[in-house]
Amino acid sequence: MAGPMCLCGMMRLLTALFIPVLITSVGLCLIFVLLFICTRLWVQRKKKVEIGKDGKKKKVVAFFHPYCNAGGGGERVLWCALRSLQKRYKDAIYVIYTGDKDASEEQILNGAAARFNIKLSHPVRFIFLEKRGLVEASCYPRFTLLGQSLGSVVLGWEALTKCVPDIYIDSMGYAFTLPLFKYLGGCHVGCYVHYPTISMDMLSVVRSQHARFNNAAFISNNPVLSRLKLIYYYLFALFYGWVGSCSDVIMVNSTWTFSHILDLWKCSDRTSIVYPPCDVQTFLEIDINQHKENEEHSVVSIGQFRPEKDHPLQIRAFAALLEKKTAEQRAKLKLILIGGCRNDEDELRVSELKKLSSELGIPVEFKVNVPFEELKKHLSEATIGLHTMWNEHFGIGIVECMAAGTIILAHNSGGPKLDIVVPHEEQQTGFLADSVDSYAAAMDHILSLTPEQRLSIRQNARLSVGRFSDQEFEANFLASSEPLFK
């Protein structure tokens, strides 16, 4: 009898414990659902309706781009996307969520015209956000990915409560805002992915314990810390995959990004490659037959002053090149770094690069936030276009260098390797490298070519970049984003 009685006692105990837990769980779920419904209704009530001349409700199309006044390739995508949508959907209202409070609407639009030669045909409204600092990497010395992602949710909530759109497009890579606008805002949501927040390559770097800009040496040298970081990355990748899968339309900028986004988001039916717009036509106007064979040779780099661009590698490679040259030859070579600074952190990085060039004893010219015409002038005079970012998602600056007639030397990875610096009709279009020595050797080789050999490579490169024009981007962007407007 003791056995059955003991079993009955166990069952009564489990029942006594299970029922309160079940009731509590159901209660919490009901509270969550009720809270969600109330929040969604509250957000929907904030939605403003404007009626067009035809009596129909105007659609509000909003782009989430907290750094819209920066001068990088991502901003060129934003302005070209806006221009293309305004041409097709003339009656829509266009909004940009931005944190650029230090600039007026007019200054931002004038900046886009000066840097990218882009002018919009219709007005655009700016929603200025107060909490952009929450997505600054400097706020999160540890757990940077998680911190910035959670910060983007808070920033996204501020954006949503200030303006509830019909169509929401994240054009800067803040995927954690997508479920916010879809489920609370009731919006059709789309995104243009320049670079996955986390990738299989990042997991591989941590797993192999290699030190990089996003994997500190004290972690890579410690097996326990590397294991913990790997777990953190895997969990983050799961959440990143879920928030990304909330998007109704997914556009990516290269074969490399496409592959990684499919691995993480698993939405092949909604994902398409839309190469970013490059102002190739303006650069194709440069005559490459007359001015490229001066005795002096400049090496020009285009790219925002961010850590992943690896400008120190450019400076060290150029220093290694100069070591191979005589004093007379060194005097005829110069390195020019052209890029945009988004914040104080980027400006500090420029100061550190200047210090590095001084320590190595080499002259480097820094051109920060320069207008478009000055950028064009430097490219028209350059012999080599230099790019050093590992696993660059695409590389608009690379395409611009090729269109301008420079001989491109890019990193042997990512978009440059898979999409851009590839043979055109079986003819060479540029060079690839991946270390200080290989970059220095490649630059030395380019300078040793005859003028005729260099001209042949330039011409092949120019012929290959037509697929990256503004016109191609606009056609593909409109085709991919069309489901959002149905």
From Swiss-Prot:
User: So which stretches are on the Lumenal side?
Assistant: 1-16
Q: How does it sit in the membrane?
A: Single-pass membrane protein
- Intramembrane feature ranges: 230-250, 394-414
> Pfam families this protein is in?
ALG11_N (PF15924), Glycos_transf_1 (PF00534)
Q: Which residues cross the membrane?
A: 17-37
Subcellular location(s) per record: Endoplasmic reticulum membrane
Biological processes, Gene Ontology terms:
dolichol-linked oligosaccharide biosynthetic process; protein N-linked glycosylation
Database matches in InterPro entries: ALG11, ALG11_N, Glyco_trans_1
GO molecular function ontology, one term from the record: GDP-Man:Man3GlcNAc2-PP-Dol alpha-1,2-mannosyltransferase activity
Keywords, A to Z, come to: Endoplasmic reticulum, Glycosyltransferase, Membrane, Transferase, Transmembrane, Transmembrane helix
Disulfide bridge positions per record: none
Q: Which superkingdom heads the taxonomic lineage of this protein's source?
A: Eukaryota
The first-level EC class reads transferase
Q: What does this protein do?
A: GDP-Man:Man(3)GlcNAc(2)-PP-Dol alpha-1,2-mannosyltransferase that operates in the biosynthetic pathway of dolichol-linked oligosaccharides, the glycan precursors employed in protein asparagine (N)-glycosylation. The assembly of dolichol-linked oligosaccharides begins on the cytosolic side of the endoplasmic reticulum membrane and finishes in its lumen. The sequential addition of sugars to dolichol pyrophosphate produces dolichol-linked oligosaccharides containing fourteen sugars, including two GlcNAcs, nine mannoses and three glucoses.
User: What name has this protein been given in UniProt?
Assistant: GDP-Man:Man(3)GlcNAc(2)-PP-Dol alpha-1,2-mannosyltransferase
- Give the organism, scientific name: Xenopus laevis
